[in-house]
């Protein structure tokens, strides 16, 4: 695997086969970037399945909240690795993680299709449901 050195306020980061290591501290993540990408893919695929199974607007909102909650959990646990991955260009990502990026693209499409398939539920939100949904979305912005 190619070695990539990244600069950030936390110090220089070096991508290794075992994860991203902060060169200025003893912090080290034992999780490889490819693993974090696949955890994100799993979260998106789970959310797409939950959306597809949603029969009510509340279930749709819950599925969205679950995805955002899982993404926050991943960020809290693997933020340093995610930050390093986020600094890569799309070309670098595709070069370093071709299978993972293909899975990510498919997961994003599946999630979008699942959400579009529930447009009827989104169009009929009550004011309370709309407010709840917007709070979930705004918390992520």
Annotate the PLM regions:
Residues 48, 71-82, 108, 112:
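A structural signal for well-ordered alpha-helices, especially hydrophobic packing surfaces
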């Amino acid at each position: 695997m190619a070695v990539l050195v990244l600069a950030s306020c936390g110090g220089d980061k070096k991508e290794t086969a075992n994860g991203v290591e902060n060169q200025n501290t003893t912090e080290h993540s034992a999780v490889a970037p490819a693993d974090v990408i696949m955890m994100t893919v799993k979260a998106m695929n789970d959310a797409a399945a939950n959306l597809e199974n949603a029969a009510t607007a509340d279930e749709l909102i819950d599925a969205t909240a679950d995805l955002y909650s899982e993404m926050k959990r991943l960020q809290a646990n693997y933020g340093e690795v995610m930050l390093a991955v986020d600094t890569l260009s799309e070309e670098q990502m595709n070069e370093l993680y071709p299978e993972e990026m293909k899975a990510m693209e498919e997961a994003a499409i599946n999630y979008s299709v699942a959400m579009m398939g529930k447009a009827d539920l989104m169009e009929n939100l009550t004011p309370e449901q709309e407010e709840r949904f917007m709070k979930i979305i705004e918390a992520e912005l």
